[in-house]
């Protein structure tokens, strides 16, 4: 797996806690983690025993005519454990010993006999390995505070640490989904626009490769545990600072960005105990033994494939939509206990028939908050009211969908970027309900050589969009409406740049600065670009900025770098990428 940044998300100013809290691992948190992870030890043991029995049966079946063909692909026996066989042999030998475990007279006279040490029973005393992944976490933190630990002689200054972690109301946060050296994590950056300063604040470890991010301010409901009941509605926080993460796993993790160094997310949407592939199940005829797993059965309550896209509803703040490789779109109510039991829980709605292939992207319509827009590898886009999905409309786009966005300036307009490098603009009111009918786009951009993998629409300037592609270019476009140009719509390229991030996988406009965007890609490098440093951009968008009541700040040092700001390591200079076109 190569190093890359797969997704970037902004956090607007004034949202983050000025002084983030430290993660505390106490008994209450351990209980919450165990419940949230749905650790079912007895079920896991039973599944392992069944897997061993099935594997042994497969081995016996192959000892006949084709016994020589029993080969494991990895070069070793993945199913019949040598230790189990040795254990059986040792049991047979132990039958010759006395029932009370005392060695025989012959063994007493044998100087090489080690039966007195009961080495055959040594493994029986080790039980902790079967108690699950969280069984020994508590023992890792013997002292509640490093000040109490006598082995830590260099004490931290709480005031210095508090100052280092402080986030000012004028700071933006950026959350970056990054994989480097086979390790996946979220990196949280602080961006001070007034000083053009970008630095890493903290990071969060992830269990699998991250695919998408979505910021939200709705605190997910805490889970109820045996010793702690679900709190009342008036006892819950009303606002927060959270990031939802979709990965190659079928679950959705929600993390608080106001907690430093957490070990476990605030909430998990899905069923890790049902969808996890940690328990191997042998498949096949018995002639060969391979490490395979059963196909995950589809469910209306949770995803069984990778989560590729997330969208938070800004009007109905407790609603989160997700799109998955399992070909479904699901809706989640964050105000409900995330624990899924036999009586219910999980996703409140699952749209299983909207697409016939992997659903790559999903987004709520901010103007009509019950309407969803989806795009798929079946080369179609669909838009429908979540209350009546059967009455939706759509279009065939001719290539796999990479990204899509509603136009925040037009309730029914949206953009779609495709694998063939095109970007299409549609008016949902003109689309047919039958996909066999023609559905022409309002206009088409030949945006990139290769996939147009990133797309965003500026929330501050009407008609300003940005695209990023496999050709390593980030391009800013100006769309002039018909009423603004004498009855004729026009689309023009304002500026383009290779920001040095490799193939571009994500590019997003700032929620606060009108012409600042962030980009990440195949080089695992985050870059910010203040497009306002470009003369052509200032000229193209100057009138629109003035009409929107926005203004570009006076440029200084950053203008010498073309407005590009990156994370500067010790002894390095900021890489401004290539020059503008």
Predicted feature residues:
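Per-blade loop-tip surfaces of WD-repeat and WD-like beta-propellers in eukaryotic adaptors/scaffolds
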Residues: 191-196, 254-299, 304, 314-451, ...
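Terminal intrinsically disordered, low-complexity extensions flanking WD-repeat/beta-propeller proteins
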Residues: 1-173, 451, 480-581
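Acidic/hydrophobic-patterned starts of short beta strands in beta-sheet-rich repeat architectures
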Residues: 173-174, 227-230, 234-244, 319-321, ...
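Blade-loop segments of beta-propeller domains
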Residues: 200-243, 248-249, 266-297, 305
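Beta-strand-rich domains and repeat architectures in extracellular enzymes and scaffolds
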Residues: 141-187, 205-220, 230-231, 240-243
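Short glycine/acidic-enriched loop and turn motifs that connect beta-strands
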Residues: 181, 250-251, 260
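Beta-propeller blade termini
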Residues: 160-164, 214-233, 363-364, 405-406, ...
């Amino acid at each position: 797996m190569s190093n890359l940044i797969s997704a970037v998300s902004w956090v607007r100013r004034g949202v983050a806690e000025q002084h983030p809290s430290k993660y505390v691992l106490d008994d209450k948190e351990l209980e919450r983690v165990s419940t949230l992870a749905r650790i079912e030890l007895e079920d896991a043991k039973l599944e392992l025993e069944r897997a061993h029995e099935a594997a042994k049966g497969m081995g016996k079946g192959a000892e006949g005519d084709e016994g020589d063909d029993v080969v494991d692909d990895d070069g070793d026996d993945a199913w019949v454990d040598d230790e189990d066989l040795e254990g059986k042999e040792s049991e047979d030998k132990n039958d010759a010993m006395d029932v009370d475990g005392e060695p025989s007279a012959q063994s007493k006279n044998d100087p090489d006999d080690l039966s007195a040490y009961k080495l055959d029973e040594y493994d029986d005393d080790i039980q902790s390995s079967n108690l699950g992944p969280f069984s020994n976490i508590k023992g890792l933190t013997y002292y509640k505070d490093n000040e109490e630990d006598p082995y830590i002689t260099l004490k931290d200054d709480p005031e210095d640490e508090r100052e280092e972690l402080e986030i000012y109301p004028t700071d933006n946060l950026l959350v970056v989904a990054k994989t480097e050296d086979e390790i996946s994590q979220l990196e949280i950056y602080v961006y001070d626009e007034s000083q053009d300063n970008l630095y890493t604040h903290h990071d969060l470890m992830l269990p699998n490769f991250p695919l998408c991010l979505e910021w939200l301010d709705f605190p997910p409901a805490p889970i109820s545990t045996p010793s702690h009941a679900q709190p009342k509605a008036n006892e819950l926080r009303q606002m927060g600072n959270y990031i939802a993460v979709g990965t190659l796993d079928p679950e959705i993790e929600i993390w608080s960005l106001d907690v430093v160094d957490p070990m476990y997310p605030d909430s998990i949407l899905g069923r890790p105990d049902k969808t996890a592939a940690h328990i191997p199940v042998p498949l096949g005829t018995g002639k060969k033994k391979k490490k395979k797993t059963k196909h995950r059965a589809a469910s209306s309550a949770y995803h069984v494939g990778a989560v590729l896209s997330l969208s938070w509803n800004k009007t109905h703040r407790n609603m989160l939509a997700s799109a998955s490789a399992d070909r479904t779109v699901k809706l989640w109510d964050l105000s409900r206990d995330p624990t899924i039991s036999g009586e219910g829980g999980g996703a409140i709605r699952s749209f299983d028939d909207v697409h016939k292939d992997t659903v790559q992207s999903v987004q709520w319509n901010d103007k009509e908050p019950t309407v969803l827009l989806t795009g798929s590898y079946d080369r179609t886009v669909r838009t429908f009211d979540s209350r009546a999905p059967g009455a939706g409309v759509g279009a065939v786009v001719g290539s796999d969908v990479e990204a899509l966005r509603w136009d925040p300036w037009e309730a029914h307009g949206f953009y779609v970027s495709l694998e063939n490098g095109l970007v299409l603009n549609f008016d949902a009111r003109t689309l047919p309900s039958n996909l066999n009918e023609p559905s022409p786009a309002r206009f088409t951009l030949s945006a990139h050589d290769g996939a147009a993998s990133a797309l965003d629409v500026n929330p501050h300037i009407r008609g300003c969009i940005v695209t990023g592609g496999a050709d390593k270019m980030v391009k800013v476009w100006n769309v002039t409406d018909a009423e603004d140009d004498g009855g004729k719509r026009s689309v023009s390229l304002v500026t383009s740049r290779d920001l040095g991030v490799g193939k571009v996988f994500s590019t997003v406009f700032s929620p606060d600065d009108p012409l600042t965007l962030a980009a990440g890609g195949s080089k695992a490098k985050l870059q910010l670009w203040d497009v306002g440093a470009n003369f052509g951009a200032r000229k193209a968008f100057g009138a629109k900025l003035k009409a929107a009541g926005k203004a570009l700040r006076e440029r200084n040092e950053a203008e010498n770098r073309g407005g590009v700001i990156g994370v500067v390591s010790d002894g390095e200079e900021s890489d401004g990428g290539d020059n503008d076109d």
